[in-house]
Amino acid sequence: MQSLFNFIVQPKNKRYENEVDVDGKKLIVNTTMDDHKYVSRIGIVKSVPIIGESEIQVGDEVIVHHNVFRRFYDVRGIEKNSSSYFKEDLYFCYYNQIFLYKRNNEWKAPFEFCFVKPIENKTKFVTDQKERPLIGVLKYGNSSLDAFKISEGSLVGFSPSSEYEFIIENDRLYRMQTNDITIKYEYKGDEVEYNPSWASGCGRTY
């Protein structure tokens, strides 16, 4: 079973991550299914497209766009699956809807995307910003950046408004496109990665 142009993925667990345990009882924490923060983003690749080449393989764990597994209400108030729905808990997924893939317990970003972790702002004259703007540590790179000797752990600058917030294994990261990385900096030795306390204890990926 293969699609011509799309991956076929299955949610790793459930479509939504919206339940917490309170004194042995399940509490649903979202009030509407439209809130993308509670849509599961973790899937398992069941099939790769026939046309095109990709480093992503069957069996890889992937982080996908929040609309892939999402449900919504149409104009008549009827609950619907997203346009990605295929059948029986399987979903079509475009190549540019996959932001990370995991193989052998290691996360990698596809050619088009990368993830950057912000660093602490140590500027003495600006006290209300906890992280330095437009600069961070490359957390998950790709082969395109490797070709420019920009590898994971590099200190990089990125374009304004290019960052999109994700929580990956208790780390708050910024997803952006490869061409949003604008410069590689030299370390000064005082850089410290910044991760807010709420992210390190959330226990979710979104």
Q: Where do the model's predicted regions map?
A:
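Acidic-enriched and Gly/Ser
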Residues: 1-206
